[in-house]
């Protein structure tokens, strides 16, 4: 089957965070939404059909993850991550951010140090602080348009930390960390008593010619000292189903985490979380393959557009996902002026780079290009027009 990713669908008025909740963040709703990591493509038909079938049954009562659900998860893990997971090592989680919050509460106490690499997905910055932990930052190095880890700094910063939050693949840069990168992280963290929480939500959006490596697979040091989170939400554009999975191969870590969940009376998810995930993992592979081809074309289109029309914007092109990390500092304008132009002249909503790790990322913005190409072109045209006088 050939999927049409060029088709444009009206999403305004559907209580979409991306489309209908811009005013609290940008002061206006009159913007093109190129911010929240939510694609403007319909979910795979296999997912929609499975949900319709259950709705037609007429019963929407309490539901648990059955063997069919876990079988689909285990098969996907084996095929795509080379993980031989067992059901007892897995637990449903409503969302990875919530799952990480549970980790912070279960394994650390107020005042403990938690390590992150910046720039990084804003909840990695916010969760430790909001839970009364001390945030320690290891600043990534941007080299030849790609992020690299400063391992000397990581070694020093990890001492005294209780936990490291790892974005694998990296958000916002889209970097697919190499096996060697992950081995070194595992060795450093194991040596210094730092539990690694690996957020692998963008793993299945690793683009052709790149290979995702799941953290737990790189060494015994990694496998025995981590919690890995995976989700079909970004992959199949079903974030609203609140369906994620925690994978914990080490029994002592698993027992502590599961005991925390039990003490919190956290058990089962909503009915469509299981149905949607199982359908996606069982029948969504062809859709995903074509989606990734389309995303590659979108990335190439945006890259060419910047080079021809907006050469002062430097883009970090992703190896995974549909997010571009954009450096606007070439315009010589303050961060506030850049933001003002984007909102008031371009009327385009981009994620503010400062939220990814502080003022080191002033002048940077994250752009979501998981949309029909006509939408992408219009957004780029708007940005070009808004900055025409400072080119």
Predicted regions and their residues:
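N-terminal small-domain helix-loop-helix segment of the aminotransferase-like
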Residues: 2-95, 102, 280-281, 390-391
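Conserved core segment of the aminotransferase class I/II
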Residues: 49-50, 220, 224-296, 304, ...
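Conserved core of the PLP fold type I
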Residues: 60-187, 204-205, 212-217, 221, ...
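Helix C-cap/helix->beta junction micro-motif
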Residues: 131, 191-192, 222, 346
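PLP-dependent enzyme catalytic core of the Aspartate aminotransferase-like
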Residues: 222, 341-350, 356-391
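Conserved glycine-rich beta-strand-loop-beta hairpin in the small C-terminal domain of fold type I
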Residues: 278, 294-303, 315-328
